[in-house]
Regions:
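A detector of single, family-specific signature residues
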Residues: 1-192
Length: 192
């Protein structure tokens, strides 16, 4: 009887909408702005707890890295570049037990349904490369954004999904017209 009541209490379902059991008990966003000087939670996918975890791992003195590329490489979010005879062999990222990289990958994986430029970027990569590689590439992009925000005290400017899609469309049209011109053709816009 005692065991049954203990099990009932232990495995009782939480009420829906009760929030996360790991929710912070203080206003972390305002403390993050005070500590870092910028609002890191403005980046899609980055919550206050994620930003705290990343800041606690990397610190606020980013002068250890000369560039955002070195920072991303330290996190283990850059692909390897093995080359033999001019041919690229493999592109796996190095395995790392870095908690900041894990937090960035989790943040990137939450962007699949986000209606932001980063969400559209993630979905485009996911359809082309697959989920694991898309998560790593998007985490790399978020890491570079965070590095630039903290080091240069720049606020994140969300341009939105539509801006990203229009920019991608313009880039496709430019590339198609260049290829057509090289083949001796000309692209013309038609009205529908």
């Amino acid at each position: 009887m005692i065991l049954a009541s203990y099990c009932d209490r232990r495995y009782k379902k939480r009420k829906s909408g009760s929030g996360s059991k790991n929710k912070l008990s203080f206003d972390a966003s305002s403390h993050l702005i005070r500590i870092a000087g910028v609002d890191l939670t403005a980046i899609p996918g980055i919550e206050a707890s994620t930003a705290l975890k990343i800041i606690s791992e990397i610190g606020l003195d980013l002068n250890r890295w000369n560039s955002s590329k070195q920072f991303a490489s330290w996190l283990g979010l850059c692909p390897g570049n093995k080359v033999s005879g001019g041919k690229r062999l493999g592109g796996k990222s190095k395995r790392t037990s870095n908690n900041a990289a894990s937090a960035l990958k989790i943040a990137a994986s939450t962007l699949h349904s986000n209606e932001s430029a980063l969400g559209a970027f993630f979905r485009r990569l996911k359809s082309r490369l697959g989920t694991p590689q898309a998560i790593t590439v998007t985490a790399h992009k978020i890491a570079i954004i965070m590095f630039e925000m903290i080091k240069n005290h720049i606020e994140y400017n969300e341009v939105g999904q539509d801006y990203y899609e229009n920019q991608y469309r313009d880039r496709l049209i430019k590339n198609l017209s260049f290829r057509a011109k090289n083949l001796g053709f000309e692209l013309k816009k038609i009205s529908c």
